[in-house]
């Protein structure tokens, strides 16, 4: 991803829901660079969804809209449990 987008991505990681803040920002800071380009695009796409949607996916209350987002959510969950 273009270096110019890093600030925007980091800003979008800051969520209105504190629980999501505690999950998404640390994942971004620790693992984003290690993701493939496709996974990075999926991460950015995931950030465009609302906090309630993201929270439901992370808490397994409803399925994510794509397999790629589901896989990324599971990586975020695994990073929390590690």
UniProtKB/Swiss-Prot annotation:
UniProt keyword terms in alphabetical order? Chaperone, Cytoplasm
Q: Does the keyword Transmembrane apply?
A: no
Q: Which domain of life is it from?
A: Bacteria
Which GO CC annotations does the UniProt entry carry?
cytoplasm
Keyword Cell membrane applies: no
Classification via InterPro entries: SDH (IPR005631), SDH_sf (IPR036714), SdhE_FAD_assembly_factor (IPR050531)
Biological process GO terms, please?
succinate metabolic process
Where in or outside the cell?
Cytoplasm
Q: Which Pfam families match?
A: Sdh5
Stated role:
An FAD assembly protein, which accelerates covalent attachment of the cofactor into other proteins. Plays an essential role in the assembly of succinate dehydrogenase (SDH, respiratory complex II), an enzyme complex that is a component of both the tricarboxylic acid cycle and the electron transport chain, and which couples the oxidation of succinate to fumarate with the reduction of ubiquinone (coenzyme Q) to ubiquinol. Required for flavinylation (covalent attachment of FAD) of the flavoprotein subunit SdhA of SDH and other flavinylated proteins as well.
For this chain, the family text in UniProt reads: Belongs to the SdhE FAD assembly factor family.
Protein name as it appears in the record: FAD assembly factor SdhE
Originating species? Haemophilus ducreyi (strain 35000HP / ATCC 700724)
């Amino acid at each position: 991803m273009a270096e110019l987008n890093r600030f925007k991505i980091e800003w979008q990681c800051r969520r209105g829901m504190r629980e999501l803040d505690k999950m998404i920002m640390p994942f971004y800071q620790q693992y984003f660079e290690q993701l493939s380009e496709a996974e990075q695009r999926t991460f950015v796409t995931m950030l465009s969804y609302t906090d309630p949607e993201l929270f439901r996916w992370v808490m397994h209350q409803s399925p994510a809209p794509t397999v790629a987002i589901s896989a990324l959510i599971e990586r975020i969950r695994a990073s929390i449990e590690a």
